[in-house]
Amino acid sequence: MQLERLPSIAFKSPAIALSGVVDYEMYTKFRTQFDNASEEKIVVTEPSTLGGDPEVARMMGEDIRFASEMEPHRRFVFLGKAAIYSAGTTFMSFFARQNRYLARGTRLMIHERKLSKKLVVL
């Protein structure tokens, strides 16, 4: 599904504004703001984070993914500001590609997962 690019005005007052470490405290703030935005057609989530707990990021992301599937008439948008590191990029990955935006100058950090290679000798 191709969505139109949102104009700048759509980001004036984000429904969800998060900053700091991705942790259970951030999740609580996220859920409170997310629940308060239940009537909004466009729900902008504006995080800035240097990282944190990837499993908490996945919990927030699953909330976004589930709401996107259950309420297709609503649009859930990510607007990264300043820094989106580590767990922040995990969270961003749950938003549809056409709903991922970054403010000018925002930095992303994406970790490469290295798997050890174990040889099995027969």
Residue ranges with predicted function:
Residues 1-122:
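Terminal-region recognition feature
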